[in-house]
């Protein structure tokens, strides 16, 4: 500041010195200064002048005053007035000299002023001299003034007036000039003042800026000082901490030393004791040996002769035994000879029987021919009679009316002729029908023979071991068979004779009518005769087949048949007798109907007959149910044969299956339930009308003969294609395998009731254990605090105790609370649970978040819920006698095992034979082998110190196993997560457990779960499991959690039957494949994320037929790199709604409903109802309040567990029995209302459709309202819409679906309408492996009869309705249905197309947005490329490449199996594929991405990636040209084996990439190694490499261009004529040039200025000089740019992908690279 002031002062003084101011100017300045001071007061107030300026101003003012005074003095001087003009000049000179002496400071200025005055005067004088005549007259103003001045002086000389006038004039002129000068000077002064003010302001501003900068710097310095101070403080604090830690460590070290000293002392003492004991043992052993030897010597002397006698007796016995064996062998040989003779006799008898059978067949054929001849004769007689009648009519009409009635006669002749033609046509049709019926009968007989053969084969296998049948019984049986055959023949002949007589009588009766009636009867009667003849032949065929079944089976069976004839013949006789009786009844009924129903329609007659036959078969269901399994297997095998040979066997198999209606009646339930091949599909494409008519087979029955005729004619016309069979057969085989699994499980399961009874009957041995007593320092619970919690006066009245956050307490005061029911002590510092033995009514204990180490809660029988989470427990002991515990939570403890712990109750037996009780012990020294009754095995049991240290013999009398859970007989929920479990063997003592959580432990295997038959939820995530737990007996399992384990295979799933399993999570494991999951019929959620699943084709097989799967997670698996993985999975899984966390908009509800109806729908309904009941139970009882528990909630929880136990046991028994029926209140009411429930969904839909058809009728008692409510509750629609929806579904499934599926089927079949009989047989089939009681069997049979009666009544009613409805418009409803269906299909297709278009547009917009976003981020990153991030330099020695080692150890893989089908190891991660190499569809909006590379890339080579060219901006300046000729030459470079291997291994399309890899690997060797190699060796390697790349020369084609470093070889035209030496020299030059031009810019270093069109991409010289190599794309990561790897349907895809990078996977393989990347890139 002082320097600035001094500078200002100096400048002001310099400016003031330059100024020259006169006295007048000073006056003006003063006047102006006054005015300016008044106007500039505001300025002066704001800006104060410095002192120096003020001082100068004052000096100027003083000088101006002095000048004025001097001037006035001169004017007043008298001498001057009297003197002349010259005197004045003298005075002036004098004044000048005077002033100069007085005022030396401003003398120069005064001299200047005076000189100017003189000049003016001189000029005036000149003017006066020039005009001497002119005398200025005094003005009138002057004269009076002069007069006035000098009035009295008359003598005064007035010469001064002139002078005065002149002076005045000169003064005025001077004044004017001075004014002008003053104005100019003022202007200059003003401008100068303005400039100075501006400079002053600028300097002030600079000063203020300097001040601000000073303050800022001051603050910075202060902040730096503070930071340094903070750092110093932190360092001091850290040093203090370090010193404290070191001090603590030192203290701990000292403690450890003390402990080690103590341990060494104890060890020394123990060693001394052991030495003493060893000495004692040696002495004892020596004594024992001596005693043993002495005792052995005494015993040998005493018992030697006895032993010798025993040895001799043994030898004698052995010899006797040998003699007996020889006798036995002789007897066996005799028996063998006798059996051979018997077999020879039997063979002779068989031959005789064969001859008899052939003879009978001949007789049968002869009889058949006779019957045909008789029938032909009857037909010929009828024709003759018809012709005679017609001729008689003509004769009579011509005789009576010859003339007048000619026209009428002609008309009658035409009518008669027409009748004759109609009769002929009917006869021809009947003959055709008869032939068809014969074919049908033959096939049916063959089918029955096969069935009988299989039944006899089965029975013969069972009776093979019975060899005690005598020959007499066999002969008697043969005689009885012959008699039965003869009787059957006689009966057949008699029946034929009777029927012929009846037909003759009917003919005679019909001839008595009118002529018109006779014609009608003769037209209709042959039809009836043909029907009756066909039925007769059918009966005859049945008789003959039944007679010959035994003979045919004897040919097949051979020797075993004779052994088993007794049993088989008895059963066959019973079956034959029953069949004959029933056939006779049917024949009688048919004859009566033929006599009484001649004028009825032919369809109704066959319907009645068929209904009666089916009713008879339903009554005979008990006799035939044993053959059901064989029939099922036979049909299944036939379906397979048809699948293999569809063209050859289509017609034959169709007839066989069609004609086995009688044998298939017992299996129809299963076929209808599973939508099996039989009865599900139509025969061929052209049977649309027939399919429509037979679509409602369950309510309609058509004529048998018409159906056979239609099938036979139309199937010959339209033969189906063989490839169309695969779909239906695959579905059928799938459903058959599911049912097979269910039946196999029913055979092999462990009955849960037996396990439960064994557990209940197991004796619990209680022993006293040492219990840790609480410390005396902790206080007991205060009685007053307990009583304040409720309205209680004494502790005996207390029922609930709740405390939280107590410092520490003991529960001794609770011993007086005898009525305590609810105890909650959270965070109360408890160390043990004790003193509760008197609280017998205690139900609920909540002691979470304490420090409990021991439990003492024995004999609390009412205890239900125990919550001990977050404590310090190490075992499960202390709950003995608490038999009613239902929920036990022990998470976050230190429990190590649920396994068995043993304790021995030992007794010693001394030498005298006395027994001494030693007590129990758990410490052991050695082992002894003991039989364990619980495990049914021998095991090594420890011997304790009590027995080991004794000198006597020992005896383990009782061995007790204890696991801590054996007394918990009703435990249902056990939670043991976050413990230290290594063993779970004790779970076998808890068969009632329903919920088990053992997650986050150290388990390698889960044992004891086999007995937990009611287990529904199993959580095992976070363990070390390598295999699946054994789940064979867990049929009720609903959730299985196996996340974060080491499971590598799930093949055990294929052997498990888990029909209720809904949720499976196996994420974060090492799975490379899964088994097919179709048999998990209720599976809804599957999580297999973060595994090693890579094969999409096998994944499609795994998920095939999982129709209930709604949610699937596959994130983190390599198969997501496939292009079409999403579409292929959605095709296989129609019901999928959530895929990898994204909600799908699927239009597959109709498909899922159809698939839900597939299979054993009754069983599916059972599973769904059970799951629904479990969920409803949870909703009703679990309030969802979280951790808030009260006494009411505890009681509610106990009720929930009781209900859960009842439901679980009931459903378990249902699965074990194989019962498929759903028992509900609504269904019981439905049974009362005469509508019994069936097994399948189709019957329910039939009922709903039937009810909807009868909506208009007011009285419909067959369908109750509650049943309709139950049906509508299962569907998401309202009750009013159920009828329409179910009707549409029913029509689509039963009417239209058959037409569509007829293309995929070549087996013409017909369904049997009686489905309730089927249900009874399916129930019997499910019970085949269980032996039910007599009451259950009786109930089942009664129900079957009752339901059969109901269904027969309903079918009669439905047939009436159907006939009434189909007479008028037979095909109108069917056409309407087909039209409606086509319209629906078109609408669905249009809607799907619109939705697909909309989805494509949305995806395109979304992907464009994401791409733009990524490009902006990439461009920003390019701008900020030069960041402060430091990369570690790469050691290029890591890239050393050994070609020989690569050739030796290279794995030659099949290119077809790479990369999707080759399975990696479990510890390897799958690298993401480059989408540019994959085949992607035009429909997929995917952008290919290229990986970041260390070398510079070529722009034209990577045209497919526009982003890559932007990312690598450096490559634009240094890339080489790429010509199409080089592309064609690259395609022919496949000769090198190494390049082929690399291209096959890595999947490269272009061989150039493999060459680049090899050359780059060779070039990236370190310089040190290159220096070590000799130049000749390097030259040889170079030649070898050149020879590998060289191409064969073709004479016709131009030599292809080589893009390498040695292009000059091809360009040189003299290359062909050069010798070998010149070639070597040239190669050396090129190698020298290559070695020297590898590093650096080629344009500058190349000697020949060659073209740098290099074969490989160039390495950056900066990289070779030690610069940084960017091996990872730092702009956008590859996972983000690869749009194929994640779905764009959700906006959170990018965030999810970024979260994946930070997600830690426990089993993921770490990277082996040495590079370090900054945090921004990761």
From Swiss-Prot:
Domain of life: Eukaryota
Gene3D superfamilies on file: 1.20.5.190, Ribonuclease Inhibitor
InterPro entries: IQ_motif_EF-hand-BS (IPR000048), Leu-rich_rpt (IPR001611), Leu-rich_rpt_typical-subtyp (IPR003591), LRR_dom_sf (IPR032675), P-loop_NTPase (IPR027417), SDS22/Internalin_LRR (IPR050836)
Short name of any one Pfam family annotated for the protein: LRR_8
GO annotation terms (biological process): regulation of signal transduction
Residue ranges, annotated region (Disordered): 23-47, 182-202, 265-285, 319-367, 1506-1534
Compositional bias ranges of the Polar residues kind: 1506-1524
Biased composition (Basic and acidic residues): 265-278
LRR repeat extents: 819-840, 841-861, 862-883, 884-905, 970-991, 992-1013, 1014-1035, 1036-1057, 1060-1081, 1082-1103
Domain LRRCT, chain residue ranges per copy: 1117-1157
UniProt keyword terms in alphabetical order: Leucine-rich repeat, Repeat
The IQ domain, residue ranges: 283-312, 1335-1364, 1395-1424
One Gene Ontology CC term in the entry: microtubule cytoskeleton
Compositionally skewed regions (Acidic residues) per UniProt: 38-47
Keyword Repeat appears in the UniProt entry: yes
Record-given protein name: Leucine-rich repeat- and IQ domain-containing protein 1
Organism: Homo sapiens (Human)
GN (gene name): LRRIQ1
